[in-house]
Structure formats: structure tokens, C-alpha cells
Design a protein with these regions (language model features):
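C-terminal soluble interaction/assembly domains
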Residues: 114-129, 136
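Short acidic/polar inter-strand loop motif in beta-rich domains
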Residues: 145-148
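Solvent-exposed, acidic/flexible segments
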Residues: 78, 100, 127-130, 134
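Short glycine/threonine-rich turn/loop motifs
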Residues: 1-100, 105-108, 115-118, 152-191
């Protein structure tokens, strides 16, 4: 599913991150990036203090611009650091803004290719995973948790499974059931 493109694991780096910044289409659900970026640039041009930048990052929508606030590089709009997957089973909620309650939500988000936006990382494309494959991938992710957290991990998997059975806000039913190809809505402009 191309997860290892960003969540790299090796003997020297067993936590599963490339330590880079990517726009994976999370912030795009909430923001008009260009307008927000222009507002941020106006504020940054006034040489805002470190305290003011911290306040903006913590208390305003400017935080959704991600790395751009630091670099001012448009290619960094909406880009956030790749999180590690070690112990991912016990670290909910997920994504930079905590907007995804379960690992099912995370995989559903990636399965449909994130939220389209002009700054979306080029590696983020629909995955075309079936429901069974989504469930298998989630189960695999729970295996990445250290044995010291085994009890918490089992309880969290059960909790997330129950939540996912009730509500899957990021799931695309047509893609998951393979009624449409995952790229069809983007290619045709139809939903």
C-alpha cells in the first residue's frame, strides 16, 4: 500500500518514519490554503515575535499550513512531519490534528487518496484496498506495538473496532466495495 515510502523501517531506524514533511491531505478538508497562506505571509512580513508565532500556531487556523509557516516555501503548505508507527496502536487519536479516532479512519483516508489539494504530496494516491485488506492492514499496525503495552494495545484495538463498526467518516463505500476505481472521481470530476 506504499506506506513504507514514508514510514520506513530498518535496523538502524525501527520506528517507521522518514522524518520528512508531507502534505497527505488532512488539512485540506478544513482550509482554503491560498487565502490562509497569504494571511500568514502578511503576519510573517511584520516580523512577528516567537511568542506571536507560537500563539498563531497553537490558537489559529494558520497551524493547518504546517511546515510552510517555518519555511515560507509554497511546496510546504499543509505538510507535516511523518509520524512514527512504532506503538501506533496505543497513540490515538491520529494525524497532526487528532482528527482521526481510529486506525480504520487513517487507512480509509489513505485508501481514497487523501483530500485532493494542489499541494498534496505526489506519493499520495488512492490505494484501492478492499474492506478485508483495510482490516488486515489495521491488524498489522496493531502488531507494531511494544510488548510492554500489550494489555493496552488489545483494549485499544477492541475500542477502535467498536468505533469503526459504528462510524467510518473517511470511508468511501464505492472504493472499498470496488464499485468504482479509486481514481475515477478525480479523473471524471464526479463524486
Amino acid at each position: 500500500a506504499r506506506c513504507a515510502s514514508c514510514h520506513q523501517m530498518s535496523a538502524s531506524s525501527p520506528v517507521g518514519t522518514d522524518n520528512r514533511f508531507h502534505n497527505v491531505g488532512v488539512s485540506a478538508r478544513h482550509q482554503e490554503f491560498e487565502k490562509l497562506a497569504n494571511t500568514a505571509l502578511e503576519i510573517l512580513a511584520k516580523n512577528a515575535s516567537k511568542e506571536e508565532l507560537d500563539r498563531l500556531a497553537l490558537e489559529t487556523d494558520i497551524s493547518e499550513l504546517g511546515r510552510f509557516v517555518v519555511t515560507r516555501n509554497p511546496s510546504d503548505i499543509g505538510a507535516f512531519k511523518t509520524s512514527q508507527v512504532r506503538n501506533v496502536g496505543v497513540t490515538a487519536p491520529y494525524m497532526h490534528d487528532g482528527s482521526m479516532a481510529t486506525l480504520w479512519d487513517v487507512i480509509d483516508h489513505y485508501n481514497k487518496g487523501g483530500e485532493a489539494n494542489r499541494y498534496l504530496d505526489g506519493g499520495i494516491e488512492p490505494l484501492n484496498l478492499s474492506e478485508a485488506e483495510v482490516t488486515e492492514l489495521v491488524a498489522f499496525l496493531f502488531t507494531l506495538t511494544d510488548d510492554r503495552f500489550a494489555n493496552s494495545n488489545r483494549a485499544e484495538m477492541d475500542r477502535q473496532r467498536q468505533l469503526a463498526a459504528q462510524r467510518r467518516p473517511f470511508r468511501d463505500e464505492d472504493v472499498a466495495s470496488r464499485k468504482v476505481l479509486p481514481f475515477e472521481p478525480r479523473a471524471t470530476g464526479k463524486r
